[in-house]
């Protein structure tokens, strides 16, 4: 993200304070993230908050609310997503923030988004293109969700969303993976309480818990932001995002995660960035572990993969990787 962001605006220097909400992240990985950030320390800072080790009000409530999820939601999502409902309490020092998911790749400058006037909106977000998943009406979305519920073993009951509510979601298909959040207005309007109250009435009936909540509770007060701030890779090349240079953030929501298969859209670009971090040995090990999937690649993607790998297999990296494997073996032996 920081390699793509502007460092000043109208002659004023910008500073990016990044807050990572984590769940039992190891001290080793925290240090790796800090090392990855160090080249950008002149205009950025990073802090970590472990929600499982924090007894403050917002995080204890998050743990309680997570217990109300249906089995499907508990398996698909972490309790981290519920932190979005309590952003005003988690970050009392700010009036406005940008929040984004971690399954993302920044390919452009997002700083301009922060200065977007809110005009009485609780938050700004982009809309998904539902036509990409063959949904062209509220009825299509309703049927899709019914089938999804049955497939996931979620029973329909009085807490399930009504056709009218699904219609609201269809008309307002906002994706919560990137949000410009007006925390000052949240506090003024007691929005957190409204979100929690609505959640308690529907809890186990929600398939996309916090995203559905935001749309249904905040409808009419959501600012539609340019889709460039939250682009699914499949959107590139469509009328919404004609080319990659039109995007600021690629968001790998749904199942096509770039670390799962090198043939997925923009997997190569994601790996190029990942190899520049302090996690390069883990990234390489993951690629090796997925080697069986490469037989599924077409000839173009196979060539692309081996050309990419060839640029990474230098002497220095291979020595680092061997030392990494030795350390992991010793660590495993010592912990027996």
Predicted regions and their residues:
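Histidine-anchored nucleotide/phosphate-binding helix
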Residues: 1-11
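Short internal beta-strands
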Residues: 14-24, 125-127
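Short, charged/polar "capping" segments at the starts of alpha-helices
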Residues: 24-32, 132-134
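Short, aromatic/basic amphipathic alpha-helical patches
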Residues: 28-43, 139-142
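Active-site-proximal specificity loops/subdomain of glycosyltransferases
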Residues: 35-89
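Short, surface-exposed amphipathic charged segments that create phosphate/polyanion-binding patches used
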Residues: 58-71, 138-142, 239-245
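GT-A fold catalytic core of metal-dependent nucleotide-sugar glycosyltransferases
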Residues: 80-138, 180-181
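A glycosyltransferase accessory/donor-loop signature
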Residues: 158-160, 165, 169-171, 175-336
């Amino acid at each position: 993200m920081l390699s793509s962001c502007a460092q000043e605006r109208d002659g004023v220097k910008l500073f990016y304070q990044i807050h990572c909400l984590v769940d039992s992240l190891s001290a080793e990985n925290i240090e790796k993230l800090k090392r990855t950030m160090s080249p950008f320390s002149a205009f950025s800072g990073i802090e970590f908050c472990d929600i499982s080790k924090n007894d403050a009000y917002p995080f204890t409530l998050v743990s309680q609310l997570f217990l109300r999820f249906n089995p499907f939601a508990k398996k698909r999502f972490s309790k981290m997503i519920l932190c979005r409902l309590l952003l005003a309490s988690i970050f009392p020092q700010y009036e406005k923030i940008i929040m984004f998911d971690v399954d993302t790749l920044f390919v452009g400058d997002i700083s301009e988004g922060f200065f977007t006037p809110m005009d009485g909106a609780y938050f700004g977000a982009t809309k998904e293109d539902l036509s990409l998943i063959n949904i062209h009406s509220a009825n299509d979305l309703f049927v899709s969700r019914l089938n999804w519920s049955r497939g996931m073993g979620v029973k329909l009951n009085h807490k399930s969303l009504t056709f009218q509510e699904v219609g609201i979601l269809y008309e307002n298909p906002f994706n919560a993976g990137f949000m410009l959040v007006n925390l000052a207005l949240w506090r003024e309007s007691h929005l957190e309480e409204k979100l929690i109250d609505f959640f308690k009435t529907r809890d186990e009936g929600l398939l996309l818990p916090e995203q559905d909540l935001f749309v249904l509770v905040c409808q009419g007060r959501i600012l539609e932001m340019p889709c460039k701030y939250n682009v699914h890779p499949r959107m590139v090349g469509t009328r919404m995002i004609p080319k990659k240079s039109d995007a600021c953030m690629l968001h790998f929501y749904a199942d096509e995660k770039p670390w799962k298969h090198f043939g997925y859209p923009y997997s190569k670009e994601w790996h190029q960035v990942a190899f520049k971090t302090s996690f390069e040995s883990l990234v390489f090990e993951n690629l090796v572990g997925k080697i069986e999937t490469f037989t599924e690649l077409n000839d173009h993607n196979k060539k692309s993969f081996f050309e990419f790998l060839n640029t990474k297999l230098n002497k220095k990296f291979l020595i680092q990787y061997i030392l990494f494997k030795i350390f992991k073996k010793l660590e495993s032996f010592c912990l027996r």
